[in-house]
């Protein structure tokens, strides 16, 4: 039974998304349906966590909009994500960056990872 579930979910997994991790700044292009029309909405921010595995894997992106912190959680393998761009790679030592919620302004910046 377990192998059957794995076989079915394997077909649903996305392989077209770039590799990203907590601390990276990403731009997520989300398909939004309003009435009978569909449009693309862009959400740009820092990945503060990535959890789960397989089909149920999710990631949370945080941005500050007009002085208010906004966090949005996306399933990694959803067809609602049209495109995901990694803008910059962050250098962090934690898997969950919840401490960014308390930081304001320049203190909330993350060092950029240098290419090696």
UniProtKB/Swiss-Prot annotation:
GO annotation terms (biological process): translation
PROSITE patterns: RIBOSOMAL_L19 (PS01015)
Gene Ontology CC: one annotated term: cytosolic large ribosomal subunit
InterPro entries, per database record: Ribosomal_bL19, Ribosomal_bL19_CS, Ribosomal_bL19_sf, Translation_prot_SH3-like_sf
One GO molecular-function entry: structural constituent of ribosome
Keywords attached to this entry: Ribonucleoprotein, Ribosomal protein
Keyword presence, Nucleotide-binding: no
Role noted for this protein: This protein is located at the 30S-50S ribosomal subunit interface and may play a role in the structure and function of the aminoacyl-tRNA binding site.
Family according to the record: Belongs to the bacterial ribosomal protein bL19 family.
HAMAP family hit by this protein: Ribosomal_bL19 (MF_00402)
Protein name: Large ribosomal subunit protein bL19
Organism of derivation: Geobacillus stearothermophilus
């Amino acid at each position: 039974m377990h192998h059957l579930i794995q076989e079915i979910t394997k077909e649903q997994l996305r392989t077209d998304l770039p590799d990203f991790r907590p601390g990276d700044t990403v731009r997520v292009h989300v398909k939004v349906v309003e009435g009978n029309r569909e449009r693309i909405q862009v959400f740009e921010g820092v990945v503060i966590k990535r959890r789960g595995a397989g089909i149920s894997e999710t990631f949370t992106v945080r941005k500050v909009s007009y002085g208010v912190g906004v966090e949005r959680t996306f399933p990694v393998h959803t067809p609602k994500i049209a495109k995901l761009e990694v803008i910059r790679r962050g250098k962090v030592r934690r898997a969950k960056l919840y401490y960014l919620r308390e930081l304001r302004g320049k203190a909330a910046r993350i060092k950029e990872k240098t290419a090696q």
